Amino acid sequence: WIMGHMVNAIAQIDEFVNLGANSIETDVSFDKNANPEYTYHGIPCDCGRTCTKWEYFNTFLGGLRKATTPGDSKYHEKLVLVVFDLKTGSLYDNQAYDAGTKLAKSLLQNYWNKGNNGGRAYIVLSIPNLDHYKLITGFKETLTKEEHPELMDKVGYDFSGNDDIGDVAKAYKKAGVTGHVWQSDGITNCLLRGLDRVRKAVANRDSSNGYINKVYYWTVDKRASTRDALDAGVDGIMTNYPDVIADVLSESAYTAKFRIATYDDNPWEMFKN
């Protein structure tokens, strides 16, 4: 999965997919009542990027729905996965459940079109704080209450705080999560970070009793770091330059081992060669 980083304006969906992304990451900020409010990152952000592009969250979902609904004039067949980077740092811990509830209602209405031919992309809820695991509970219980529990088949999870892998496993246990887990690791492109924790995550993914289904690394903009991440065995790379990742994937060293994921590749299943 080539994951376009910080896609917060509707116009950027086309831009990143046209550069080669089959997945995008979108920032979601919340108001003080835990309503998802804007797709917005703010300053500071990655080096070389404009930090302040934004839409209202529900407006963005409408654009995203069009981009992922077959038959729509804006449809991109290859856009198959969306990571919502949930900026829950502005919330109190006890608001996490409410944030999950409100997020589910927004997606149900504006993205899934109440289950009636809505957008088809797989969704990853990426949460920065392990203490906010109840966001997952709130999300799940709301879809059940709204009589669309089947939509959870399209939803996965990530804790993005680079926490100890054992601690992440405990948070999933509390949230009752037993699958659909993406594990992120990384740092802003302005700084360097080694691959030690990525290797631990990959080892967990590949073990018989691990909790991780997929591993992605962020934010990778250079060919050398792309090769290092691929050599470590990641499933996804988040980038500001999808064309760079696509270029490296077309090198002879990688064409035999990797291919770009399509809609038929289940993002919740471990890839077995």
Swiss-Prot record:
Binding-site residues, Mg(2+): 25, 27, 85
Catalytic activity: an N-(acyl)-sphingosylphosphocholine = an N-(acyl)-sphingosyl-1,3-cyclic phosphate + choline; an N-(acyl)-sphingosylphosphoethanolamine = an N-(acyl)-sphingosyl-1,3-cyclic phosphate + ethanolamine; a 1-acyl-sn-glycero-3-phosphocholine = a 1-acyl-sn-glycero-2,3-cyclic phosphate + choline; a 1-acyl-sn-glycero-3-phosphoethanolamine = a 1-acyl-sn-glycero-2,3-cyclic phosphate + ethanolamine
Cysteine disulfide links: 45-51, 47-190
UniProt GO molecular function: lyase activity; metal ion binding; phosphoric diester hydrolase activity; toxin activity
Class in the EC hierarchy, top level: lyase
Gene Ontology CC annotation, any one: extracellular region
Keyword annotations: Cytolysis, Dermonecrotic toxin, Disulfide bond, Hemolysis, Lipid degradation, Lipid metabolism, Lyase, Magnesium, Metal-binding, Secreted, Toxin
Secretion signal, residue range per the UniProt entry: none
Keyword S-adenosyl-L-methionine: no
Places the protein is found: Secreted
The UniProt record lists the keyword Lipid metabolism: yes
Cofactor binding comment, as recorded: Binds 1 Mg(2+) ion per subunit.
Protein name: Dermonecrotic toxin LsaSicTox-alphaIB1aiii
Species this chain originates from: Loxosceles sabina (Tucson recluse spider)
